[in-house]
């Protein structure tokens, strides 16, 4: 549960409902990674514009992103419709927060964090192409991971000024959210492990985390391996750079 703090840094949010706008594409076709990365950056940009309004007194009609900025082209038709959910000026009175949560499945892709070591990718470029798996270096923390069908990926675009300005707290809160969701789904035995991020079951990693924070606005997030489809391409990498550690999926642990 995210706790709103009443600190001096959060004075601008006193009396403001911290509502979250949900974009749920988890039941749709898997989405190409780069397209949704651009959407994340657009949502973060909208947050930054809002902060300029609140703290620099910029005219209010500049705080809302033009929905045309989210038109991603014909090659990205799998995300057509997300602009319909974007905030526009006439929605100003109804929207209390720019916090957003995107749920989706991705097309097969390996992502490397900013400082990730490419030695943890076992496949060469030719093999990746034959398998139809993209390899992308992105702007999050953490080592290499895999996204694909059968995996629930969540991208919280949250302004931490409305919660707690502590990245370690945020990472633990994401883990806690996964643990609570699994428990509510009847999945028993999910735990944290000391000195490593993520959620584990019977020694296998079922959920991974990797985030970026810009001006205390978060992007990227978490991925939960739900069914066996999510596991097929992990053998092409050393997941999260953890040698000798296995990955698993939630369905293996359902009663």
Where are these regions (language model features)?
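Conserved phosphate/anionic-ligand binding catalytic regions in large, soluble enzymes, centered on
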Residues: 214-232
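Short conserved catalytic/interaction loops centered on acidic-Pro-aromatic/His motifs
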Residues: 189-192, 220, 231-236
């Amino acid at each position: 549960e995210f706790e709103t703090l009443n600190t001096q840094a959060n004075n601008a949010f006193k009396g403001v409902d911290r509502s979250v706008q949900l974009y749920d594409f988890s039941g749709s076709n898997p989405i190409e990674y780069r397209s949704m990365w651009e959407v994340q950056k657009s949502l973060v940009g909208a947050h930054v514009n809002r902060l300029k309004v609140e703290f620099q007194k910029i005219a209010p009609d500049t705080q809302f992103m033009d929905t045309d900025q989210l038109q991603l082209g014909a090659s990205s038709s799998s995300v057509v419709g997300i602009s319909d959910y974007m905030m526009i000026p006439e929605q100003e009175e109804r929207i209390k927060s720019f916090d957003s949560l995107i749920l989706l499945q991705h097309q097969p892709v390996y992502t490397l964090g900013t400082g990730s070591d490419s030695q943890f990718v076992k496949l060469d470029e030719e093999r990746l192409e034959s398998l139809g798996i993209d390899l992308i270096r992105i702007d999050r923390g953490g080592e290499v991971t895999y996204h694909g069908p059968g995996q629930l990926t969540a991208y919280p675009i949250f302004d931490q000024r409305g919660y707690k300005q502590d990245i370690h707290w945020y990472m633990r809160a994401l883990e806690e959210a996964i643990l609570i969701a699994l428990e509510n789904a009847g999945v028993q035995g999910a735990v944290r492990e000391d000195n490593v991020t993520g959620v584990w079951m019977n020694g296998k990693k079922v959920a991974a985390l990797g985030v970026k924070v810009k001006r205390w606005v978060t992007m990227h997030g978490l991925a939960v391996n739900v069914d066996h489809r999510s596991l097929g391409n992990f053998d092409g990498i050393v997941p999260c750079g953890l040698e000798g550690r296995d990955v698993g999926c939630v369905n293996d642990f359902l009663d």
